[in-house]
Amino acid sequence: MELVNILLESESERVKLYYDIPPKKSLRTKCEVDRAVKYFISVIKKYIKLKESTFYVVVKDTTLFTYKYDKGELTPVDNTYYTFSKELASTDYSSSEITSICFTITDDMSISVKPKTGYIVKVRSDNSRYY
């Protein structure tokens, strides 16, 4: 599974986060998606103040799963048929090189993100949809 609306950035590259499903799990369950979301948030918390932030987490497996993180509360939200463009990104994640975190939002997503000291928050908009 991959996190499609949040990228980590260093001076030289963008890093997309992935969550590996155990090999014996060919059918994805809600538990697996929940584990992936918790993993992604555990990485994101290194760069932003979670208790002061509101943002969306969009996980892609065979479909998109969208969650709203609101100052400690995680809630699933309805998919609004937005797509998220593919970014050129490396999968090599090294937290020592990260300087910023980039959120992709849509017209339906309002966010408020507080970065930790030394990190930059970037936001871009992508309103592409499939019908």
UniProtKB/Swiss-Prot annotation:
Q: Which organism is it from?
A: Fowlpox virus (strain NVSL) (FPV)
User: Could you tell me what this protein is called?
Assistant: Protein E11 homolog
Per the database entry, which stretches of residues form a coiled coil?
A: none
Q: Where in the cell is it found?
A: Virion
Sorted UniProt keywords: Late protein, Virion
Determine if Cell wall biogenesis/degradation is one of this entry's keywords. Answer: no
Q: Which Pfam families match?
A: Chordopox_E11 (PF06138)
Q: What is the lineage of its organism?
A: Viruses, Varidnaviria, Bamfordvirae, Nucleocytoviricota, Pokkesviricetes
Q: What induces it?
A: Expressed in the late phase of the viral replicative cycle.
> Cellular component terms, GO, for this chain's entry?
virion component
What the record says about family reads: Belongs to the chordopoxvirinae E11 family.
Superkingdom of origin? Viruses
